[in-house]
């Protein structure tokens, strides 16, 4: 007699607790949720607002408040300073001294017509501070020197082996003239890989005779040159003039034209 045919028994099984039921788009009303199977292991508490690791700077939480709109970001003044003054500088720190370059804006005076004119050009203030320890500088003993626009131009024209010297008397034309002497020398280093900035100050009013020098590398001097080229129009007030030009307010040039101007406009 042949053996009996095997019997197959099919039993309905409960879906695993970690799986969600399949969603059928055509019949959303028939969607049911299978309650998870009770487990003896206690689930860890989930925080209401997850916090990303500090390493993930690109984490975005839709519940978090939106970031600021850029008032305090790169290229713009901080909050509340849109109409205020912004100070900036370029500083170089070496073993024996530190040197800071600080631009100063031109002085504008109002006219009766409501316009403005430049009464005094801006300048770049050089501040030398001697070192008192490793990476420590005494800014209370600093010596300063103001570079005018034409002095900046002289510095920009220096060749690899050229040097220049500027002399200042802060009291020139006054009764104390000659009592304070400041001499700034800029000369190449012996190896030709940089510059020396040397400031000598003699002040007989307070019995000071001091000389502070600092070596400047080629890279640092390149930054100085690039910055000076950029800042010159701003120190002269020309950038402010260009920003004030408005096509809708332009009027015909009414000053009598010279022969050369007439030839130029032909």
Swiss-Prot record:
GO BP terms, alphabetized: defense response; DNA repair; negative regulation of DNA recombination; regulation of DNA-templated transcription
Phenotypic effect of disruption: Albino seedlings lacking plastid ribosomes.
Keywords, ordered alphabetically: Chloroplast, DNA damage, DNA repair, DNA-binding, Nucleus, Plastid, RNA-binding, Transit peptide
Transmembrane residue ranges: none
Region (Disordered): 53-81
Molecular functions (GO terms): DNA binding; RNA binding; single-stranded DNA binding
Chain intervals for the UniProt region annotation (Required for ssDNA binding): 94-99
The UniProt record lists the keyword RNA-binding: yes
UniProt keyword Transit peptide present: yes
Chain ranges for the short sequence motif Nuclear localization signal as given in the UniProt record: 172-185
GO CC terms of this entry: chloroplast stroma; nucleus
Subcellular location: Plastid, Chloroplast stroma; Nucleus
Transit peptide region: 1-37
Leader sequence residues: none
Function: Single-stranded DNA and RNA binding protein that maintains plastid genome stability by preventing break-induced and short homology-dependent illegitimate recombinations. Functions in RNA metabolism and is involved in the maturation of the atpF and 23S ribosomal RNAs.
Sequence similarity: Belongs to the Whirly family.
Subunit details: Homotetramer.
Protein name stated in the entry: Single-stranded DNA-binding protein WHY1, chloroplastic
Source organism of the structure: Zea mays (Maize)
Gene from which this protein is expressed: WHY1
């Amino acid at each position: 007699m042949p053996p009996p045919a095997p019997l197959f028994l099919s039993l309905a099984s409960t879906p695993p607790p970690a799986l969600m039921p399949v969603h059928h788009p055509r019949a959303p009303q028939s969607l049911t949720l299978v309650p998870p199977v009770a487990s003896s292991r206690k689930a860890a508490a989930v925080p209401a607002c997850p916090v990303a690791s500090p390493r993930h700077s690109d984490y975005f939480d839709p519940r978090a408040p939106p970031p600021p709109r850029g008032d305090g970001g790169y290229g713009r003044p901080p909050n509340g300073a849109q109409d205020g003054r912004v100070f900036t500088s370029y500083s170089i720190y070496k073993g024996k001294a530190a040197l800071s370059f600080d631009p100063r804006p031109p002085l504008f005076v109002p006219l009766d017509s409501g316009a403005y004119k430049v009464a005094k050009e801006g300048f770049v203030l050089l501040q030398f501070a001697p070192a008192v320890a490793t990476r420590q500088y005494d800014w209370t003993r600093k010596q300063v020197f103001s570079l005018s626009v034409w002095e900046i131009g002289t510095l920009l024209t220096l060749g690899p082996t050229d040097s220049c010297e500027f002399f200042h008397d802060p009291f020139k034309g006054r009764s104390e003239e000659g009592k304070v002497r400041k001499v700034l020398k800029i000369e190449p280093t012996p190896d030709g890989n940089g510059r020396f900035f040397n400031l000598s100050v003699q002040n007989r009013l307070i019995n000071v005779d001091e000389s502070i020098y600092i070596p400047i590398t080629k890279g640092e001097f390149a930054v100085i040159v690039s910055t000076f080229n950029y800042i010159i129009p701003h120190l002269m007030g020309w950038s402010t003039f260009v920003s004030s030009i408005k096509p809708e307010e332009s009027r015909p040039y009414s000053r009598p034209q010279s022969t050369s101007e007439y030839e130029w406009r032909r």
